[in-house]
Amino acid sequence: MVGSGSHTPYDISNSPSDVNVQPATQLNSTLVEDDDVDNQLFEEAQVTETGFRSPSASDNSCAYCGIDSAKCVIKCNSCKKWFCNTKNGTSSSHIVNHLVLSHHNVVSLHPDSDLGDTVLECYNCGRKNVFLLGFVSAKSEAVVVLLCRIPCAQTKNANWDTDQWQPLIEDRQLLSWVAEQPTEEEKLKARLITPSQISKLEAKWRSNKDATINDIDAPEEQEAIPPLLLRYQDAYEYQRSYGPLIKLEADYDKQLKESQALEHISVSWSLALNNRHLASFTLSTFESNELKVAIGDEMILWYSGMQHPDWEGRGYIVRLPNSFQDTFTLELKPSKTPPPTHLTTGFTAEFIWKGTSYDRMQDALKKFAIDKKSISGYLYYKILGHQVVDISFDVPLPKEFSIPNFAQLNSSQSNAVSHVLQRPLSLIQGPPGTGKTVTSATIVYHLSKIHKDRILVCAPSNVAVDHLAAKLRDLGLKVVRLTAKSREDVESSVSNLALHNLVGRGAKGELKNLLKLKDEVGELSASDTKRFVKLVRKTEAEILNKADVVCCTCVGAGDKRLDTKFRTVLIDESTQASEPECLIPIVKGAKQVILVGDHQQLGPVILERKAADAGLKQSLFERLISLGHVPIRLEVQYRMNPYLSEFPSNMFYEGSLQNGVTIEQRTVPNSKFPWPIRGIPMMFWANYGREEISANGTSFLNRIEAMNCERIITKLFRDGVKPEQIGVITPYEGQRAYILQYMQMNGSLDKDLYIKVEVASVDAFQGREKDYIILSCVRANEQQAIGFLRDPRRLNVGLTRAKYGLVILGNPRSLARNTLWNHLLIHFREKGCLVEGTLDNLQLCTVQLVRPQPRKTERPMNAQFNVESEMGDFPKFQDFDAQSMVSFSGQIGDFGNAFVDNTELSSYINNEYWNFENFKSAFSQKQNRNEIDDRNLYQEEASHLNSNFARELQREEQKHELSKDFSNLGI
């Protein structure tokens, strides 16, 4: 037995007899997962808590339950609290629970334990992150050595059997020879603590480190958050529903951002092309994985130490870590006090939260409610969910929809263009590789020529906006790209279209002189600044007014520089935006709106769980489908080898996808890659490695899958494939980081080749493609818990990025329990592509695929699936889209279709439809108008229905209970 600082092996001859650790039950998905905001750390039922003793803050007892056995408790070295190694009613041991929730990772054993007062650390390098640590046995029997997973466990050593490295944490608790399990008698005396209490106690400790379980026992009243509705009586009810959810999300985002202070960082200094100082810093994997950072985020960098007077500077993030480099780069704003560039250590960085995006969403809701000119009457009532008469625009259609010297449209694309040009509201569903960007660009081109008016083109992300702006530029349109001030120094593929660059290039006279003076001096006088701002604003307005198309993000549409009306708004990737986000460009005076997206792929990212559960994670695109608005689907895919498109087409698009490329066009001749079936470039390679907790304690990795991933990439390199052609997709940040590290340490070819291979999340690959995709599933445990691999949308994206070849690495035993993955495995088996063995000797996999058990869940009519926790099975319809009524994203569609078996509901729908048929008849004389945009006209024409509609809304709410009669629908 040795102390922590001596870096000598641990003598375990007197330790518990089970030191020869057998493969243990694997980690459960109830551990917190990165990018998984809906997942809970714990899922167990509440347990009674009376009659047990409370832990004492003055001794070495568990801060959760009070167990004080020296052999069972471990100290968290960050907060100096003690925790036991038992689960006792929770999904993870108390010490692991605490480490995960607190983001701590250094522990030490009790002085009276078998191993003594020992800080657990790596024998070679001294790293103390317990989530990184594992053990290997010495060639002599009675000694083990602790090594970190990477790099030390990857280093060959004659004295240690590093191939047998095992993590110290298995089954979500420390191995029993590190910290024993308490006796049954000790468990009975301990206080039972619920997962909910643990979460509250950890939150309490952030503000009061001396808090105990007694401080959180008092029940707290929490205001109930009503779910969003399908239909709204008026815009005020709409605003009252969405406004609180936006505030919830904003408050959560603010708390998250402001908690991300980075202390004791080392900085390297350089100069940007504009002569501004750049501060670059690298964080540990643990720290960088926890950060939620985007290009353009504002930060404060400051120094306080003995070597220089206190200094503080502000700037914007201009570069983030990626597959090719691991640094964050901050561009500092000009300041009278220069930064201490001669210093590199002792700096602290803090993020500045800005609620601009949330403020603009709230403003859009208010504008929608009170400004009748913000949107046409037709669109107003459509968004509220009222049944209004469909109208069409009497516009001259082009003889040919395809544009000369541009991509030729197929029939489904031409149909989409024709439909959109004549309708005030259109939904275009673009499955993977179907050319929705080409279709969108063609639509914008024709609308610009027909109406001779500016068009506002938006998307949730800057990448999507830039991509579409480039296409529109290629069509010869005058395109202006509006970016946030914080992103003006970030280079992109369309920087030449950026408004600030157009202002600089077109500056004349006084403005040109002021720009030159500003560049030379760095700062203008107060009077010059005032004049400069005025001239810039005037020039910006002139440029925007002369544009054919203005491109910006949805949030960017709320910029004051766009304080004008736009008749036509097109939103690309609209299914990735929340509804209030989409509303920002729409309330710029829209009379014609085109939403482009795919609700079978990834949806909006909502961090606050309550807001997500209440419905904020549903896009406007999806809700309109639920209201019966049928999207136009693009049906010809040009990306994937037809063998790769077969399963996604049948599973997610009712087999409607046609192939615009042949097998020959997507087959590499003379390839020597060992595909199981020659001519079918896909395989599911069964991997039976164990999942492990990653370095940050909140994610997962799988070493066997990472090792085989490197072997596949090396094999592709030897087959002539370039690094830029390969993409590795994994849902877990822990696996992403580990694969990058593993390839650099163990790749058998030039290390620079492996650096150029992109390894990223499913989200990062949405809308993109690679010639070859490797999908690492990671999850492998006896509980068959697969986390957010259950989300069909994530699987759809992962399966549809590859053009020439797809390799899936996963454990079929764990995945087969899920209905969707079961179908996928059966598909690969039927094709002869479900294999196991070594890459050079693949054999058909003989593992038995256990039939998944269907789950029956009762939900109210308007309820949504919690994608991460409830998507175990499909809705029981004959197809997977049910005529755009029920999608895998879990949205229940039109009542008249979804519940046709219920007489009362059918009668209700029919009566409502009859009323609106009368309205339609009365309105028919106005159907041929080019545009109906007077909200008062609709109000007058529909006044006889308003009171009926209000009553029907109330009846609709009362019918929630009827959903219990429809459990046979499986939704």
From Swiss-Prot:
GO cellular component: a single term: cytoplasm
Amino acids binding Zn(2+) 1: 62, 65, 84, 94
Sites where the protein binds Zn(2+) 3: 122, 125, 148, 152
Start and end residues of each Upf1 CH-rich domain: 54-208
Compartments where found: Cytoplasm
Pfam family, one: AAA_12
Region feature (C3H): 62-94
The name this protein goes by in its record: ATP-dependent helicase NAM7
Source organism (scientific name): Saccharomyces cerevisiae (strain ATCC 204508 / S288c) (Baker's yeast)
